[in-house]
């Protein structure tokens, strides 16, 4: 199609030359005929006037007037006058047209010049058009090439996309498989952790009741059974049991002097419950003391000995290092119902060279009582406060349950929790003993106290 148009463009000037030449010839013919006709008319009028003039000034004649006609027989004669005597007068026009043809030639030259200029302009316009067509053709070729490249790029992108889709599908399948394996692994780890915890509890029970106490025995003073009852010979009482055995059997505040702390400190002694001689180290009864304290307070103790108080981890450790102690916990709810739990083996930091660095771990086993065992699962755990997290939970159990305790992950008892007065909407953040009242009942009264095991008396 482009080549046909190119041929048409190239053939256009020749056709225009032929048309222009024909137009020039036709124009010259019209002008020549017009001039000749004008001259003929003028001559005819002149001849007619002359004849009339001659007729006017000569005697009238009986001869008929001359007849003026165009001579069709002689193509060179413009007009023929036939006289009365049948003679003819032919009027000719010089075919060279001496005055008209130069002007016609000038006009023709002007027209030819104009036509030449017009042809030149058309040729110039045709050249510009050809240049424009060439430029457009180049641009179209470039665009076609670019489209072809883009199409090829798009095909490559589609291939890459398909490959990525396949790889992503494979990765998703692998991810699902790994998630399944991880879930199974977590389940196995949880089972293993539970098994290990049970084994540790068993070992701790054995340690608490048997040979591992040897290390603690080596750090203790001579056996209590070797010392006379009543602290004879001026010896100082090591705990409330010594005071009870010396004859003082009224409840109250007394001074005790543990073997490894000869300067001593004061404690509250329960001389009436289950045979007396109990050294109290924790009491909750009215909510008058804030038990949501930090590490230093729980290490050193706080509160009032005759009311709500915590003796202190250091004091509990010093007492339980002297002999084999048992723990008694008395509980009371807001309906005045009571229950108790006794652990025949109890100690804090028994096997620690530096108990504070070790977190004052608890050893407790051999439960009996009516409240249910809500402390045995805490055996072996370090003490946790709101500012020192020693538990196994991702969160700080002391902060989460608003207390301080030997938390594991997190608790089955929380006797240092908030004093919430019975049933509460929050979960397990009151004074809880879950095996007796569940996790949403805060007890009215609790008391934790220790005494040497009776077989050592």
From Swiss-Prot:
GO terms for molecular function: chitin binding; metal ion binding. The record marks 401, 411, 427-428 as: Implicated in ligand binding. NCBIfam families: GGGWT_bact. This is Fibrinogen C domain-containing protein 1-B. InterPro entries: Fibrinogen-like_C (IPR036056), Fibrinogen_a/b/g_C_1 (IPR014716), Fibrinogen_a/b/g_C_dom (IPR002181), Fibrinogen_C-term_domain (IPR050373), Fibrinogen_CS (IPR020837). Ca(2+) binds at residues 389, 391. It is found in: Membrane. The keyword Disulfide bond applies. Residues 231-454 form the Fibrinogen C-terminal domain. It is a single-pass type II membrane protein. It holds the Pfam family Fibrinogen_C. Keywords: Calcium, Chitin-binding, Disulfide bond, Glycoprotein, Membrane, Metal-binding, Signal-anchor, Transmembrane, Transmembrane helix.
